[in-house]
Amino acid sequence: MSGSRGNSSNSSVSNNSNNNNNNDGGDERLLFLRSVGERNEIGFPSRFKSAHYKKPTRRHKSARQLISDENKRINALLTKANKAAESSTAARRLVPKATYFSVEAPPSIRPAKKYCDVTGLKGFYKSPTNNIRYHNAEIYQLIVKPMAPGVDQEYLKLRGANFVLK
């Protein structure tokens, strides 16, 4: 029995020493990693990066700033050209050049995409009775054809194509 007591006390002592060793091992590991990090640092500046380079504080301008800057640039060009044109009698009025930033663009020439009012898929067909767009014949047979008169106006209202009788 005395031998087992001694073993248990020895095991607790050895556990404490293991805990100390684990902490020492962690400290050794940190010291090792720090020494490796110090060895990896380059003592001279890289030839690929300028020594005077500063990271810009802001990368992109907001859309409002881009539009206002573009308008200022266009107005400056127009006033300069108008002053030159006032001296000549041939060109009295200058039209601004179309740019990507001009907000006053005409509507698109491309036709608007048409979607099914029921499913949201591409609407290839349009019902002749109530003007509801539908994707295929199955949707027409099951949903559009037996639709009640008030319900079709609700679908058209979602699209903004409803008509109100006064």
Swiss-Prot record:
User: Which keywords does this chain's UniProt record carry?
Assistant: Nucleus, Transcription, Transcription regulation
Q: Which InterPro entries match?
A: INO80C/Ies6, Vps72/YL1_C
Something else the entry says is: Present with 1720 molecules/cell in log phase SD medium.
Indicate what this protein is called per its UniProt record: Chromatin-remodeling complex subunit IES6
Q: Does the keyword ATP-binding apply?
A: no
The keyword Nucleus appears for this protein: yes
Region (Disordered) residue spans: 1-28
Q: How does it assemble?
A: Component of the chromatin-remodeling INO80 complex, at least composed of ARP4, ARP5, ARP8, RVB1, RVB2, TAF14, NHP10, IES1, IES3, IES4, IES6, ACT1, IES2, IES5 and INO80.
Could you tell me the superkingdom of the organism this chain comes from?
A: Eukaryota
Identify one Gene Ontology CC term for this UniProt entry. nucleus
**Composition bias type Low complexity, residue spans:** 1-24
What gene is this protein a product of?
IES6
Q: Which GO terms describe its biological process?
A: chromatin remodeling; DNA repair; regulation of DNA-templated transcription
Q: Would you identify the family this protein belongs to, as annotated?
A: Belongs to the IES6 family.
Q: What does this protein do?
A: Probably involved in transcription regulation via its interaction with the INO80 complex, a chromatin remodeling complex. Also involved in the regulation of telomere length.
Q: Where in the cell is it found?
A: Nucleus
Where is this protein chiefly located?
Answer: nucleus
